[in-house]
Regions:
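Core alpha/beta structural scaffold of self-assembling particle/tube/pore-forming proteins
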Residues: 2-79, 92-435
Length: 435
């Protein structure tokens, strides 16, 4: 028989000896482990602007330059004349020219070991098949990267270093200089570090820490000589100043009077410059969007600015909302009412529908004319294939097959704007607190 113990022990001393009570650790090997069937994603794959551009049918081209004809200048010779036998003189004609472009090629590379594949290839082993997940999301990730590329000026710059700290062979970069922070780069991405002039390559490394909220990344290995002001450039670009990347919004929406645009000299061809409104680091105010749209009308005519969409970061949408809140009136009715001091998504800036993208420069609002934006394509987005194969084995150091596979999502494309004068932008806007 067992006697009730006066002590809280997992054992009991009786006349018949010492008896031990089994504890949970004695049966841990029998317990089942519960794994949630849900697989949340702790990051985003936003591709809002690229998806908007991709809606249009692509111009399928070869590796030869694509030509985009433009009626660049009016012509003819206007005059008064003497109808009583006077000489009408000679005349002229409108002037036509062309913009030229070539496609560039990009890839998203996914590599995994065979053990990775075999350990998850059955529902009895894992909640999902890792390889199926990789193939299902690779296209989304490539589109996300392409959306980031739409935010750079053709030089491949995806970040500007504001602070450098090195410890244990790892560089920590704060990216607080521009309006993007760490938004245009991704964890696991190989990036190159160039000096501020984009003339000197300091080195390259892999992003092993990615903190979007605090605009900070860590790069392994540490890059010798990296300093504040250096620029992060996408891997595969050797000469950023030659503009070898996708030509994004800042390239086409620019009123710069130096450099080139699709073969034109910006200094001698003002017709191909976009329309700029400089906010001079001030907060968004109501006259700025109206001025931007009126600049378009001044260039291309009052009836040619009706297809505009205002693209911006949600930070500037908030700034616009706060302007509206200052002039809002709440009419209280004699019944219980809910309170919502915020506006819905149907905002407009001077008549242009407002579209938000977290990948956008926080200091800019771009008035995009969908009628003049285009996309050239030599290779549609998809798997890189050879003889029908989409997945390729990795080779080991001996020359034999390594227990790892790789596949590539690829694309060959370029963007163009057929009439930059029909676009406008507001830049150097103050960013609301908290962003």
């Amino acid at each position: 028989m067992f006697n009730k113990s006066l002590y809280n022990h997992p054992w009991e001393i009786t006349l018949m000896g010492v008896f031990n009570a089994a504890t949970e650790s004695d049966v841990a090997a029998l317990e089942l482990e519960k794994v949630s069937k849900k697989l949340p994603t702790a990051f985003e794959r936003d591709d809002k602007f690229f998806a908007n551009i991709k809606k249009r049918d692509a111009d399928v081209i070869s590796n030869r330059q694509m030509r985009v004809p433009i009626e660049l200048r009016p012509g003819g010779s206007f005059q008064y004349f003497n109808a009583d036998g006077g000489d009408l003189g000679r005349g002229g004609a409108p002037y036509f020219d062309k913009a030229v472009l070539n496609c560039v090629f990009v890839s998203q590379n996914i590599e995994y070991t065979k053990l990775n594949q075999w350990a998850t290839d059955d529902s009895r082993k894992a909640i999902i098949s890792s390889v199926r997940r990789y193939t299902a999301t690779a296209l989304d990730e490539l589109r996300r990267q392409l959306d980031s590329q739409m935010m750079q000026a053709g030089n491949g710059v995806v970040g500007v270093v504001s602070v450098v700290a090195t410890s244990g062979g790892v560089d920590t970069y704060d990216l607080g200089t521009d309006g993007f922070g760490a938004r245009l780069v991704r964890y696991g991405q190989t990036i190159q570090v160039f000096d501020t002039t984009l003339a000197t390559l300091r080195g390259s490394g892999v992003i092993t820490f990615w903190d979007v909220e605090n605009k900070q990344i860590k790069v392994t290995p540490a890059i010798a000589g990296a300093v504040a002001g250096d620029k992060l450039v996408v891997n595969g670009i050797t000469s950023p100043t030659s503009l070898p990347a996708i030509l994004g919004v800042p390239y086409h929406h620019s009123n710069a009077s130096t450099g080139t645009w699709l073969g034109f000299s910006r200094s001698t061809t003002p017709e191909i410059r976009s329309n700029r409104v400089n906010a001079a680091s001030a907060a968004l105010s109501l006259p700025l969007p109206r001025l931007a749209i009126n600049k378009i009308g001044n260039r291309v005519g009052i009836d040619e600015n009706t297809r505009l969409t205002a693209w911006t970061h949600p930070a500037q949408a908030q700034a616009y909302e706060e302007i509206g809140q200052l002039v809002s009136i709440i009419n209280k009715e004699p019944r219980e009412q809910s309170l919502n001091m915020y506006f819905n998504d149907n905002m407009q800036l001077a008549g242009a529908p407002l579209r938000r993208s977290f990948n956008w420069d926080k200091t800019r609002i771009d008035f995009v004319n969908d009628g003049v934006w285009g996309r050239a394509e030599i290779l549609p987005i998809g798997f890189y294939t050879t003889d029908g194969r989409k997945i390729f084995e990795i080779r080991g150091a001996s020359g034999g097959v390594a227990t790892a596979d790789i596949f590539y999502m690829v694309a060959g494309l370029q963007t163009y704007v057929s009439n930059p004068a029909a676009t406008a932008y507001i830049d150097t806007l103050a960013v609301p607190s908290g962003y």
